[in-house]
Amino acid sequence: MKINNHRQMVFARFFIFLFGLFTLSVFGQSTTYTPDMMLGHRSYGYTHTVSHKLSDKLTLQNLVLFDAEYEEDTHNIFFIRNTLAYQLPKNFVLNAGFGVKNPGKFASVYLQYQVKRKDFIGVYGIGTTYQKGFTLEQSLLLEYTPKLTQEWEGVFRFSAVGNVNRHEYTRGFQHLRLGVKREKVALGFAANFEQFAMSWNHLENYGLFVKINV
């Protein structure tokens, strides 16, 4: 989808930056902020997750992603979602969220199963998203951070989301991160794969990433 108003994109990016700073100053230690920046051969991208723990069972999350080409705005990707997550027994989490993504506003309800270990995180989700019609959405996150030395850890992170309706595969992506981590900073190789069955051709982006856990 082509973004016709460049000013809107600039304003959105500025707002995203301010939102991240604001949440840290207001919520304090009960809030985590994790920005991830990528410089690729086709485009540059920014993602952040802000999580604020309301109670032992309730968590409020804000996820923002944008991906912009260097020369044109033809294939800009944007995704903003606010989610309320409720912790259920036996590693299950119920989520309800709303936001905006190409090509417009949406709402989601989905169930996750989470496995968390010292150096491994696995999350599988399934639910439904409404955006000009209902789709079945499935997601997968795998993250492995083995200890390499006293100060360094390896980083392997794979995330994928797929949406299908009764007729076709409507939207999907796969993001790969492979690198090293020291304390709160991770960096390395990044690869993003995007599919838009209803509009654009499939997109690929290869480059470097930096991720910070605040």
Can you say where each PLM-predicted feature lies in the sequence?
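Bacterial Sec-dependent N-terminal signal peptides
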Residues: 1-33, 214
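Transmembrane beta-strand segments that form the barrel wall of outer-membrane beta-barrel proteins
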Residues: 30-40, 58-70, 82, 88-102, ...
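Transmembrane beta-barrel outer-membrane domains
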Residues: 39-45, 73-77, 102-106, 131-137, ...
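Membrane-embedded beta-strand positions in outer-membrane beta-barrel channels/transporters
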Residues: 47, 79-81, 108-110, 137-141, ...
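Residue-level signature of outer-membrane beta-barrel architecture
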Residues: 52, 86, 113-115, 144-146, ...
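Internal catalytic-core helix/loop-beta-alpha segment
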Residues: 123-143
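Outer-membrane beta-barrel "beta-signal"
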Residues: 202-214
